[in-house]
Amino acid sequence: MNITIFGATGRVGSRILDEAVARGHRVTAVTRSGTSADSVDSVTWIAGDARRHRDVRRLSRGQDVVISATSGPRTGGDELAITARALLVGVAETLARLIVVGGAGPLIVPDSDGRLVVDDPRFVPESIRGVAEACVDQLDVLRENSTVDWTYFSPSAELTAGRRTRRFRTGTDQLIVDSDGTSRISLEDVAVAVMDEAEQPRHLRAVLTAGYSQLVQRPRVVGPANLRRAEVTS
């Protein structure tokens, strides 16, 4: 496939780039400067800005998928929403699919009667609430569009550099948590999940999430009948 990646040198974007190259795709890697220290035959580095719809249109022509892994300021604001609008306008004419990598803020907390992650201090401390709210606005912009084939990737609450395990669970609009209540995934497995969706789209105009989830092992309940059976066979 031909893929354009905005934010290709960021924490997430650089790993998506590596994953795409490893899978044999041709990548147009977009940064503000258009330069990178890496040199790979299947990657073309070019300058561009995802906030400018003309740049998005120019860099999505002839591409199968456009992936945006740009970030916004920790204080929040409207930059992510502005970028989402520019991306939608830019790919509308080229018919490329759009995958936007956002944050966990818009996801629903399990067993919470619809409470969003952005409103749960267990996952979003006050110091990053601004950017979490910006991610909610970012998704709202996408949801208003019914013509572009977009996917919003909303990761687990905790993102860390780690290993590429490919052992994670995917879902839609609900936060994935482990048996101890944590929500986490490695940046490397985020790249795997995003590229899986790029290759085999299953979440068109929808949210995709991914995270580690170990099922709680429930103790076996031994009833009177089982006890009698055990006594007979012992």
Region roles according to the model:
Residues 29-36, 156-157:
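Short, polar loop motifs at secondary-structure junctions
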Residues 112, 145-147, 160-167, 197-206:
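Glycine/proline-rich active-site loop of Rossmann-fold NAD(P)-dependent oxidoreductases
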Residues 26, 34, 85-130, 136, ...:
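Conserved Rossmann-fold NAD(P)-dependent oxidoreductase catalytic core, especially the SDR/UDP-sugar
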Residues 134, 182-195, 206:
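Substrate-positioning beta->alpha
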Residues 4, 34-94:
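NAD(P)H-binding glycine-rich loop region in Rossmannoid oxidoreductase-like domains
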Residues 3-23:
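N-terminal Rossmann NAD(P)H-binding glycine-rich loop of SDR-like oxidoreductase domains
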Residues 139-161:
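Conserved beta-loop-beta element that borders a ligand/cofactor-binding pocket
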